[in-house]
Amino acid sequence: VSISSSEIEELQRISLINNLSVCVDFEYRAVPLFLQTKKLIDENILGDIYLVKLDWLMGSRSDPKRSWNWYSLEEKGGGVIGALGTHAFDMLNWFFGESINVSGKLATSIKKRPLPNSSDLNDVTSEDVCFANIEISNYSSNLIPCQVSLSSISKNGRGFSLEIYGSEGSLILKSENQKDYVHGFNLKYSNNENKIQNLTADSSFNFEKTWTDGRIAPV
């Protein structure tokens, strides 16, 4: 992931010169309950999908006293789109299909932060809030309306929530864990009879070993 195609080309050039492999770590594609969600969508358990809503409201940058760093700079790729949005938009593409119409609103709520080891304040140019309205094209004839809300300044926010509503039922994948972005997910399914079920991942999606820190491994 980069902020320009020229940077991607430069990374590819450097990797080839040094005989290195380059990949993007969209780790949520390996998290068991995300794999379970993908399986259920592909099995058409929800029927025609009417609405997708993805909220990712985290508080990692909610303290205005947190030091200024590269994350505060738009030109360095800082901001909630780079931190959360890249994963959110990859999820939507993976689960449902291509996003073809996008409109949005960005905001910088905390406009200055203290420099490290200093009381001096420096400008913040990167966004800490993003709202997006999206139309997704998939196998069905109808475009799927989708709404995305991202925030890194939502202290005690609701965390991650993906709601999928269809003609035959709904799925809700969520986690309120503010300390670990990978652990703590749960998945609920309800059909047209309004029976809500807590779902677990198929054993084939689980890993033999897990780590307590979700940054080390996606399970």
What does each of the following model-derived ranges do?
Residues 1-29, 44:
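Beta-strand-loop-alpha-helix segment that lines the small-molecule cofactor/substrate pocket
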Residues 4-6, 58-64, 111-114, 155-156, ...:
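A short beta-to-alpha transition loop/helix N-cap that caps and shapes the active-site region
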Residues 7, 87-91, 218:
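Hydrophobic alpha-helical segments typical of transmembrane helices
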Residues 18-20, 139-145:
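A short helix->loop->beta-strand "cap" motif at the edges of active sites that frequently abuts
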Residues 20, 28-124:
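Predominantly a Rossmann-like dinucleotide-binding segment in NAD(P)-dependent oxidoreductases
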Residues 25, 53-54, 103-104, 133, ...:
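Short beta-strand segments
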Residues 86, 149-157:
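Glycine-rich phosphate/pyrophosphate-binding beta-alpha loops
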Residues 115-116, 122-123, 130, 137-141, ...:
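C-terminal glycine/acidic-rich active-site capping loop/insertion
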